[in-house]
Amino acid sequence: MKNISEFSAQLNQTFDQGEAVSMEWLFRPLLKMLAEGDPVPVEDIAAETGKPVEEVKQVLQTLPSVELDEQGRVVGYGLTLVPTPHRFEVDGKQLYAWCALDTLMFPALIGRTVHIASPCHGTGKSVRLTVEPDRVVSVEPSTAVVSIVTPDEMASVRSAFCNNVHFFSSPSAAQDWLNQHPESSVLPVEDAFELGRHLGARYEESGPTNGSCCNI
């Protein structure tokens, strides 16, 4: 099985071919705003990132996975206000994530402690975690694992990647799913957390940049 660095390198290479490229200056600020628990207006994103409103609108229109409400406000991109199986509680606010790896990756990007609850994809048994920005505090059950896929293309990050990245209560609980997805793997939660840190590193230095440019 691949090690963490190999998974990270392969996934980053695939992300570079898809919608994730457009998010390097946008993703972390957007996550922090979504973590407040309210829809995020385009104008707020522009103010936070230093980009023109029209440019932010154009980028959002190119992202097939972004979730917008009727007013055109962002309600989800990785972290979402729309219910999913992956419950993500931060500062008492009930949010959700698109996949199991998101729940482990996002605490570092938003700088907050998160309480996570998600059903085992094989048995339905609840998997519960507390994750701080720099460590996994607790996992119940301790045998929990996360499925990882490495798709060849990532035109839509949610359909190509997120929809196949689940919690399982144990490796044995994941076996039937792995038999059906032979190109996939499972990682212990601690290893999946480290993978999330590797993948999140590309966004950690992002900040306001004025004008159009290069990361889009």
UniProtKB/Swiss-Prot annotation:
Its EC number is 4.99.1.2. Disulfide bonds: none annotated. Keywords: Lyase, Mercuric resistance, Mercury. The keyword Lyase applies. NCBIfam families: lyase_MerB, PRK13239.1. This is Alkylmercury lyase. One of its GO terms (biological process) is response to mercury ion. It comes from the Bacteria. InterPro entries: MerB, MerB_HTH_dom, MerB_lyase_sf, WH_DNA-bd_sf. It catalyses: an alkylmercury + H(+) = an alkane + Hg(2+).
